[in-house]
């Protein structure tokens, strides 16, 4: 089994529970306030590690108490932290609203995540042997995302981009990506196509492949996901669960996918891992606290 390297954000998540989302200009009363570790990078690293992958993290935390707390979370999950720098200033913070239906809205203040440089990424990758997969997202600077994909590809790794949030990714960057994994909203921003229907999402996936990506996977929430390569396409059904909080579902999906691929499974089986992990993450509150274990995933897949 090769190493999964996650290049991405580490955040403190401040989660507010609401009865309903406020309208613009409206004040509503929250029910709960909780603090959790998060950030798409950390979430995906933990998701993969809990499913049995060997994981190394590359990123940055602040010089505040939150930075030390986040580093402790990384190491407590068995994730290598040699590539996580401590920089002056605050750590990244996410403000998350979750209503009673489990739907969420998220605002991210990058903090230390904005100080991850391409040189940091390249140097950290050069120190890691036997890299199977390099996974990154849109919560670190674009130049660092590009370094992760280009250097990862040069080292013979499979490169995976979760373009969340959707930035102005250059075509040259996408050509260095083996698998791109947006949700339907991010896919619409990346392609300019209407992805609100199944047909639209399929068209967006084909468009991303035409730009040079080997495989495009578009997640569609409760409607599952679709995928396309140059040779074929298909759908990824959901596993039946009762959702409580959808905050880390996409990150769990990514973690399930890379854990399966790093273990040597084919794409079709990796899709099942991804769907199961994503579904299980919706059954618990919070980001990192909701990420499933290997035994939980295997139980759901065998059900």
Regions found by a protein language model. Give the residues of each.
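Conserved phosphate-binding/catalytic region of the ribokinase-like
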Residues: 1, 167-173, 198-303
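A glycine-rich helix N-cap at a beta->alpha junction
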Residues: 73-88
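Conserved beta-alpha-beta core of the PfkB/ribokinase-like small-molecule kinase fold
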Residues: 121, 131-203, 222-225
């Amino acid at each position: 089994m090769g190493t999964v390297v996650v290049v991405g954000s580490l955040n403190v998540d401040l989660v507010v529970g609401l009865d309903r989302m406020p309208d613009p200009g409206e004040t509503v009363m929250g029910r709960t306030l909780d603090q959790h570790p998060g950030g798409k990078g950390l979430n995906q690293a933990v998701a993969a590690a809990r499913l049995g992958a060997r994981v190394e993290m590359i990123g940055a935390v602040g010089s505040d108490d939150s930075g030390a707390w986040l580093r402790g979370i990384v190491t407590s999950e068995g994730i290598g932290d040699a590539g996580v720098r401590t920089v002056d200033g605050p750590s990244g913070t996410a403000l998350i609203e979750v209503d009673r239906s489990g739907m969420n809205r998220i605002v991210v203040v990058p903090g230390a995540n904005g100080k991850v440089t391409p040189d940091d990424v390249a140097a950290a990758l050069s120190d890691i042997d036997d890299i199977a997969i390099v996974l990154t997202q849109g919560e670190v600077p674009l130049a660092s995302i590009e370094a992760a994909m280009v250097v990862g590809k040069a080292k013979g790794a499979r490169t995976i981009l979760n373009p969340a949030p959707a930035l102005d990714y250059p075509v040259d960057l996408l050509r260095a990506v083996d698998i791109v994994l947006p949700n339907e909203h991010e896919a619409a921003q990346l392609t300019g196509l209407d992805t609100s229907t199944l047909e639209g999402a399929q068209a967006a996936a084909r468009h991303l492949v035409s730009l040079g990506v080997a495989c495009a996977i578009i997640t569609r929430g409760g409607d599952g996901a679709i995928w396309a390569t140059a040779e074929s396409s298909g759908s990824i059904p959901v596993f039946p669960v009762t959702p409580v909080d959808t905050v880390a579902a996409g990150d769990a999906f990514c973690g399930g996918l890379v854990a399966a691929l790093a273990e040597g499974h084919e794409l079709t089986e990796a899709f099942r891992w991804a769907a199961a992990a994503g579904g299980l993450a919706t059954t618990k509150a919070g980001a990192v606290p909701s990420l499933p274990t290997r035994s939980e995933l295997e139980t759901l897949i065998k059900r």
